[in-house]
């Protein structure tokens, strides 16, 4: 599956879902992924976040479908178990050349390796095992690490995670990742009113002190107990206001396909980002789909149905058939989500079942 997605132009892979570092063989998995070389698309935005190659979203482009990245669920094993990220336009324009079957040659696995730049590989983790694994992952070919945490105060962190001493382990992991060259390390914090909005400024201070990029994420209706309500969301404007009272921010230009709005502190020390799918949806520039750990493609976090890729694989579908299926699914990607609207229907899976 990795070879197929790379042949379609995928340039980025993120391993996520549960805790990837618990998976046996994750270092070797990264090593194998690092051997692939993206095919078929030239970047139109050469300097995206952290210097990574970006493909500018172009839903109005006559070229139509343009794949960019993969978010890889960690629950499946082997290179046929990767999730994909792809971007498409609504108007079913003709496929770009890279998607035409006659231009997708059935090449040996080795022929798509060792040419050009490698895939941009990242992992999202809770960080508890990162201290010991950062250097092996870097040596295997990993480029970046994102750590998920909802508090930067040690006592609060322990109450949330129920892991005594956990904050020190995670902090050591982030520092090890930074020292290994897996940076800038990103920290994702989901904000929920009445739970951890008092951590906004402490996280900003943490970004400055530790040299990490903190990204605040608006709380979305994807939780198991369905407690989401508009009042639980801490919106982008409030985050900026609270942070601005601590220290002025300057917005940083970013690629349109980036999910986060990026800001630097006025003295140049420290960066934060805000991912605001509720108050400022970015559906029009979304460049991602996922494959869940049970082999289902989801074109949006809030999809009310899945597309069963695993069933095709189980029944012996050829590479061309799998590629055509993926393309067809992406062409059906939702225009937007409907969070907060009267006709909003909750996603068919909660976040824990989607994977990170």
Residue positions per predicted region:
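Radical SAM/AdoMet-radical enzyme domain recognition
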Residues: 2-14, 23-38, 112-215
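Catalytic-loop Lys-Pro-X-Asn motif of eukaryotic-like protein kinases
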Residues: 17
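Intrinsic disorder/low-complexity segments
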Residues: 35-117
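Radical SAM enzyme [4Fe-4S]-AdoMet core and its adjacent flexible, acidic
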Residues: 155, 163-273, 277, 311
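Radical SAM enzyme core and accessory elements
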Residues: 280-356
